[in-house]
Every structure is written in structure tokens, then in C-alpha cells.
């Protein structure tokens, strides 16, 4: 199964050859961080930048994770997937490589966002906070990457997947605790937020910063990651055996 490393290297090289793409993927989360943290007036008891930064980190990983489906769809449409399947390597290594790649990319982007947040006034936290944040974001990335990959294997072309990505990403983000505390939500919205994986990623990171226990949110993310890996693996085997 170590063969997945070659697929990770391939995607990292392809990403590195497109510096404009690397820059563009950072602009939106950085703009959201500056706008929500410094410009938009919000009634919040405390440093709102400390509250909103985890939400921006989660949005960054959400965007990167869903790109696993885009990459899978491109490989499928351009015929690379069939060529990879002909290689003497476990077919699951293709899927694992995609998930690991988008997780690495999301963590690199999140690191830049954390640095920007510190520059504009977010509180400095302990080393364990940043290590724990990376672990939480990695788990969350696996969940989202599996959702994206499963969707791309179920859809027929890139345009359809792009529509799915647009339809899913913003509702997931806004119907979570990324920008608004759970206690400030209307009752109907709380029910949606409780079913949203972004809420658990946000809550776990914020718990690290406030000294509360993140274990419940981490457990939920761990279960979701395991379930989505099983579903995505099943879908990938079924799609590539036909």
C-alpha cells in the first residue's frame, strides 16, 4: 500500500508547477479572514478574530478537500485513471494518494492562514494547540475528501461535479459554527449545525484554545472519517471494477 506515495508525489508536483493556482487557493480564505476578523462589525464578547480563525481554517480545508473530487474527475475524464489501474499496484493506492495529497495541501494552506491570523491580532497559543489543530484539520480533510471523491465517482462529468461542489460547499459553511456561535443561532439552524461535520471541526479547535475538552468533537470526526473511508473505498472498488 506504500505505492500511494507515488500518487501523492505526482499531485504535489502538478500543484507545484502552477504557482498561480497555489496563490489563488490562498486568496479567498485570507480575504475572508481579513474581512470577518477586522472589517465586519460583529457583537461578540471577546476577541472575534480568535473565534473566526478556526472557521476560516475549516473553510480552507473544506475547499481543498472537495478538490479531491475535482482531481479524480479530471483523471477519469482524461483517461489517466484507466492507465493507473493498469499498473501493478493496489488500486486503492490511487484513492489513498488523492486523500493524502489534499490533506497535505490543506494543512499547508491552513498553516499560512494561522500565520496571517497571528499577524493581524489573533492570540498566540501553545505549540500543542497548533499541533492539535493540524490533527483535527487532517481528520476533517479525510471526511471531506472522501465525500468529494465518492461524488466524483458517482457523477459523469466535471461540470456536474463543479455544480455539486458549489451546491455543497457554501451551505455546509454557513450552516455551521464557522462564523456564528451555536448559542446565537435560531433554533431551526441549531438542528442543521449539529449534523454538520464543520461544526465539530470548529468546536474541537476552539476547545483547544479555551482549555475545554475537544474529545467529543474529535470522536465524532474520527467516526465520520472511518465511515466515509469505508463508503468511499467501496464506491471506488465498484466504479473501477466495472
Describe the predicted segments one by one.
Residues 236-242:
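Short cytosolic juxtamembrane segments of multi-pass membrane proteins
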Residues 23-29, 156-177:
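Pore- or pathway-lining transmembrane helices of multi-pass membrane proteins that form conduits
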Residues 6, 10-14, 79-86, 153-156, ...:
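Short amphipathic alpha-helical coupling elements at transmembrane boundaries
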Residues 38-46:
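Short, hydrophobic transmembrane alpha-helix segments
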Residues 31-35, 49-120, 140, 148, ...:
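Hydrophobic alpha-helical transmembrane segments of multi-pass membrane transport proteins
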Residues 1-28:
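Aromatic- and glycine-rich beta-strand/loop motifs that create alpha-glucan
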Residues 14, 43-44, 123, 173-227, ...:
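Membrane-interfacial helix-loop-helix junctions in multi-pass membrane proteins
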Residues 91-165, 212-233:
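Alpha-helical transmembrane segments and their short interhelical loops
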Amino acid at each position: 500500500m506504500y505505492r500511494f506515495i507515488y500518487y501523492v508525489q505526482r499531485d504535489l508536483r502538478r500543484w507545484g508547477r502552477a504557482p498561480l493556482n497555489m496563490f489563488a487557493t490562498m486568496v479567498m480564505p485570507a480575504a475572508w479572514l481579513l474581512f470577518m476578523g477586522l472589517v465586519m462589525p460583529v457583537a461578540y464578547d471577546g476577541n472575534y478574530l480568535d473565534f473566526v480563525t478556526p472557521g476560516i481554517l475549516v473553510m480552507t480545508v473544506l475547499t481543498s478537500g472537495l478538490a479531491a473530487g475535482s482531481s479524480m474527475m479530471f483523471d477519469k475524464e482524461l483517461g489517466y485513471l484507466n492507465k493507473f489501474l493498469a499498473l501493478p499496484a493496489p488500486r486503492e493506492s490511487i484513492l489513498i494518494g488523492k486523500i493524502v495529497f489534499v490533506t497535505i495541501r490543506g494543512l499547508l494552506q491552513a498553516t499560512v492562514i494561522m500565520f496571517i491570523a497571528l499577524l493581524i491580532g489573533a492570540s498566540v497559543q501553545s505549540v500543542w494547540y497548533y499541533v492539535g489543530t493540524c490533527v483535527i484539520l487532517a481528520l476533517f480533510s479525510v471526511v471531506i475528501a472522501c465525500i468529494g471523491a465518492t461524488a466524483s465517482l458517482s457523477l459523469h462529468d466535471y461540470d456536474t461535479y463543479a455544480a455539486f461542489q458549489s451546491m455543497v460547499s457554501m451551505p455546509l459553511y454557513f450552516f455551521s459554527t464557522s462564523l456564528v456561535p451555536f448559542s446565537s443561532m435560531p433554533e431551526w439552524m441549531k438542528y442543521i449545525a449539529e449534523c454538520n461535520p464543520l461544526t465539530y471541526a470548529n468546536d474541537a479547535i476552539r476547545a483547544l484554545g479555551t482549555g475545554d475538552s475537544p474529545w467529543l468533537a474529535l470522536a465524532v470526526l474520527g467516526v465520520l472519517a472511518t465511515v466515509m473511508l469505508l463508503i468511499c473505498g467501496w464506491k471506488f472498488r465498484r466504479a473501477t471494477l466495472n
